[in-house]
């Protein structure tokens, strides 16, 4: 999978208080974020499909977010 770049995720971990952050930690966060994003995207697609749309809109993503 590995779609997201590591550098921004490392910055997020540091901003959260991680003085030093291992590469393994960054990769683990990337994997988790990608998994959750894919799940949310799939739910958002279902909301769009239910509304007889092919285009996933912001409201679909927000509905999927509330569901989680």
Regions found by a protein language model. Give the residues of each.
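Terminal helix-to-tail segments of small alpha-helical proteins
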Residues: 1-68
